[in-house]
Amino acid sequence: MTKWILMVLAWFALIAVLLYMKSYQSFSDRMQANEEKIYKTKKGNQRALVIFQDSKHGTVSKYADTVREQLLGKGYNVTVNHPRNDLNYDPMKYDLVVLLGPVYLGKPSKTFTDYISKNPFINRKIVIILVGYNPEDTRELKILEERLPNHNTVYTLKIGKEDTEQIGKIIKKATG
């Protein structure tokens, strides 16, 4: 009888863990609102597009703010929004495109991946920043890079929760 109860409890625990993990993936794959924000600088006239899919705990949003501030400091006018099917940004009108998103269960969100696949990034400087549990595992970056045409200069970074220093380095490298 005790073994049977333990087996039932183990199954309930397994189901609970799977549902918890699925909730993260569902959160990541949701379509966020169109919340375009345009930030102007008096330092220069270069343009940057920052597209970010927020994470469950707001880490990606925090990093998007860091990217925006750094780009403004380097003389870029910055447009910030979330990846959506109805966005009409022409990547060719931007000097730099920065894409930020979370990684859950070993993959980037479907919304984020679809946005990259559906947009004509040609001869652009592109920065891809993914936020995930294991920064050393960069398979997710390769998935996204493969969706971009070969005629782009792509800078990639996968980071954990508290790594704004790495963001500064990749932005500096991309804006050279």
Model-inferred region functions:
Residues 87-90, 121:
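Glycine- and small hydrophobic-enriched segments that form the cores of compact globular domains
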Residues 74-88:
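A short, well-structured beta->alpha microelement
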Residues 2-46, 59-62, 69-74, 96-101, ...:
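FMN-binding flavodoxin-like domain, especially the glycine-rich phosphate-binding loop
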Residues 53-54, 83, 102-103:
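Histidine- and/or cysteine-centered catalytic micro-motif in compact active-site loops
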Residues 46-54:
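Acidic/histidine-rich, surface-exposed loop or edge segments in extracytoplasmic proteins
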